[in-house]
C-alpha cells in the first residue's frame, strides 16, 4: 500500500486544528492523512548558563552610548563582539550594566526581528504542527524556533541540544511503539542500562514505560535571563515567563499545567531559585 500524503496540521487561535489538501492527478491514488496533536502539552523549558543569554540595552543607555543598535551582549554578532575589545573600561561597564540591560527577546512587531535574530537559522526539526516529520517549510521552522525563545540564547552553543530535545521528545512512538533511534542504533534509549551513560544506578527504560508518556506534545522553549543580576531576580523573571507559556497552551485548549525544566551551568542555580518560595515561587508549575 502506498504511503499517504501527510498534511501539515495547523493550530488556530481558538485551539482547533485543521489541514488543507490539494487536488492531485488521477494517477495519484494515495490518500491524505492528518495527524492531530495530543490534547496534553508538557512544555520543556531550557535555562542556559552564565553569559548564555543575549542582552540588549535600554533606550536611554543606548542614547547615552550613541550606539547604532541596542546590543549589549550577543556573542554570535561577531562585529559587535569585536568592537567590545576596543571599548574603554567605563564604556564596557555602561554596556554591561544590570540596571540598563534586559533579555533580547524575539518580537514579531519589530520590523527587523528576523534579521536581528538570524543566529537561529537552518533549524532541522520543529514539531509545531501535527506532521509526523515536523514543519516542512524552512523559514517557518526558523520563525517558530525564534518564537519559542531559541534566539535569545547562544544558539551556536545550545542549538544542537534544543533541536535534539524537540526532535526526540516529539518522535518517541508511533502506533504505541518506540520509533527509530529510541529503539535502535547508537542513540537507543529503550532497554539500555543507564550505567552506560554514567549513572550510578537505575533500571533501563522499557518500551512499555515509554508508551505511557507518548500521549503528549513536548514543545521545547528556551528562556534567557539577565545574568548580570542576581539569580533570585532571574528566577522571578523566568517564573513569569513559564506562567505565560502555560497560559499560551491553555488558551489553545491544551491540557497544560506544568513544565519540565532543563538547565546548564549557572542556569541550575536559577532553576533552584525558580522553585524557592522566596524567589521564583514556581514549585506548583515545575514538574
Positions of PLM-derived features:
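N-terminal non-catalytic accessory region
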Residues: 1-262, 268-287
Amino acid at each position: 500500500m502506498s504511503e499517504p500524503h501527510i498534511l501539515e496540521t495547523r493550530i488556530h487561535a481558538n485551539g482547533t486544528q485543521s489541514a488543507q489538501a490539494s487536488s492531485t492527478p488521477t494517477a495519484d491514488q494515495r490518500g491524505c492523512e492528518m495527524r492531530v496533536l495530543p490534547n496534553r502539552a508538557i512544555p520543556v523549558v531550557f535555562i542556559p548558563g552564565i553569559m548564555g543569554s543575549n542582552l540588549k540595552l535600554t533606550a536611554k543607555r543606548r542614547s547615552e552610548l550613541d550606539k547604532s543598535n541596542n546590543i549589549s551582549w550577543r556573542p554570535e554578532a561577531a562585529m559587535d563582539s569585536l568592537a567590545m575589545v576596543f571599548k574603554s573600561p567605563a564604556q564596557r561597564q555602561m554596556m554591561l550594566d544590570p540596571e540598563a540591560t534586559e533579555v533580547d527577546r524575539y518580537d514579531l512587531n519589530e520590523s527587523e526581528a528576523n534579521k536581528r535574530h538570524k543566529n537561529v537559522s537552518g533549524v532541522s526539526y520543529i514539531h509545531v504542527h501535527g506532521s509526523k516529520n515536523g514543519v516542512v517549510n524552512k523559514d517557518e521552522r526558523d520563525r517558530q524556533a525564534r518564537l519559542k525563545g531559541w534566539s535569545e540564547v547562544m544558539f551556536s552553543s545550545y542549538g544542537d541540544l534544543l533541536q535534539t530535545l524537540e526532535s526526540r521528545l516529539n518522535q518517541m512512538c508511533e502506533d504505541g511503539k518506540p520509533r527509530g533511534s529510541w529503539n535502535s542504533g547508537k542513540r537507543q534509549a529503550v532497554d539500555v542500562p543507564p550505567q552506560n551513560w554514567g549513572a550510578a544506578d537505575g533500571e533501563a527504560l522499557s518500551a512499555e514505560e515509554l508508551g505511557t508518556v507518548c500521549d503528549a506534545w513536548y514543545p521545547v522553549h528556551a528562556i534567557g535571563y539577565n545574568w548580570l543580576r542576581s539569580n533570585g531576580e532571574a528566577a522571578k523573571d523566568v517564573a513569569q515567563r513559564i506562567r505565560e507559556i502555560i497560559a499560551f497552551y491553555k488558551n489553545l485548549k491544551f491540557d497544560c499545567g506544568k513544565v519540565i525544566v532543563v538547565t546548564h551551568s549557572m542556569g541550575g542555580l536559577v532553576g533552584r531559585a525558580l522553585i524557592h518560595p522566596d524567589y521564583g515561587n514556581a514549585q506548583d508549575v515545575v514538574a
